[in-house]
């Protein structure tokens, strides 16, 4: 059955903007890791870029969820909750992962929606699984390391040793960010294709 998609809005440009800001953010972060001094102006720009990238990403999630609803997808998280769950303590450790899987499966052009729930039969994306594992590790790693230092479980270290400990988590976060860029680009492209199919 052909489904009209009057509420569909392309998110490809938003995805490309997010990717651009993430790349700039990573470059700033690498420069910060390699630098001996912290430039206050650079630090401010660094956080402005982060906030802009975060805001765009939240908008992307809102619109991506709204788009799959316009395709006829049923029994999915609402667009508003797709944003809110990122900020709810404890739940933010798995809800965004589930939402991303929902968007991925429902956006896939191979998922033909007749009753609206066929997306549930699609397999979970492995790239999303890896991305989320890396995201959680990069989030928890520095916290655990800082906590162990605070409790004197490991000695307070100098900057050189601290870099050795924290740099692996930075690298993990870069890999996770790269996977995130691939995920949102793929979903954005799929949704554009699906929108054309639904109105043809």
Tell where the protein language model's regions lie, with residue ranges:
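Generic detector of isolated residues embedded in canonical secondary-structure elements
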Residues: 63, 86-87, 183
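Residue-level marker of positions within ordered structural domains that often coincide
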Residues: 69, 92-93, 189
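A charge-rich, low-complexity, intrinsically flexible signal that marks solvent-exposed coils, linkers
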Residues: 71-74, 79
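Hydrophobic, aromatic-rich membrane-embedded alpha-helical segments
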Residues: 79-101
